[in-house]
UniProtKB/Swiss-Prot annotation:
Xref: SUPFAM superfamilies: Cytidine deaminase-like
Segments passing through the bilayer: none
Disulphide bridges: none
Function: Catalyzes the deamination of the cytosine moiety of the antibiotics blasticidin S, cytomycin and acetylblasticidin S.
Signal peptide start-end: none
Gene: bsr
Record domain CMP/dCMP-type deaminase: where: 8-140
Cofactor dependence: Zn(2+)
InterPro entries according to UniProt: APOBEC/CMP_deaminase_Zn-bd, CMP_dCMP_dom, Cyt/Deoxycyt_deaminase, Cytidine_deaminase-like
E.C. code: 3.5.4.23
Stated name of the protein: Blasticidin-S deaminase
Pfam families: dCMP_cyt_deam_1 (PF00383)
Length: 140
């Protein structure tokens, strides 16, 4: 997988996502936070919305992208998601998580040249959405 150097702005993006989920965490409601940075440097953050029926749950990345697009933002640079442990988990670490398949599709649709921060082998890694969803289906 092709990777890129982690910048101070990337670390700040992780911190914004971490602060968002730390502030809004609720068992069985919100345990993932996300932050997306636009190419102008603006950061939009969100938490996921969990539902009793799993397929109704909306991921934090989708909410962050939707919020940004709803406010006229279109040019995205980097996105990250972090997971807060449930209250009964022994390990209390908030960790960067890789986007699910649906979020990879959504990121690719709205930001095909976006960077994505993920954790790989315990290390923060910066890659492109194209690396995470190669040979993406397109209508063309």
């Amino acid at each position: 997988m092709k990777t890129f150097n982690i910048s101070q702005q990337d670390l700040e993006l992780v911190e914004v996502a971490t602060e968002k989920i730390t502030m809004l965490y609720e068992d069985n409601k919100h345990h993932v936070g996300a932050a997306i940075r636009t190419k102008t440097g603006e950061i939009i953050s969100a938490v996921h919305i969990e539902a009793y029926i799993g397929r109704v749950t909306v991921c934090a990345e989708a909410i962050a992208i939707g919020s940004a697009v709803s406010n006229g933002q279109k040019d995205f640079d980097t996105i990250v998601a972090v997971r807060h442990p449930y209250s009964d988990e022994v390990d209390r670490s908030i960790r960067v998580v890789s986007p699910c398949g649906m979020c990879r599709e959504l990121i690719s649709d709205y930001a095909p040249d976006c960077f994505v921060l993920i954790e790989m082998n315990g290390k923060l890694v910066k890659t492109t959405i194209e690396e995470l969803i190669p040979l993406k289906y397109t209508r063309n």
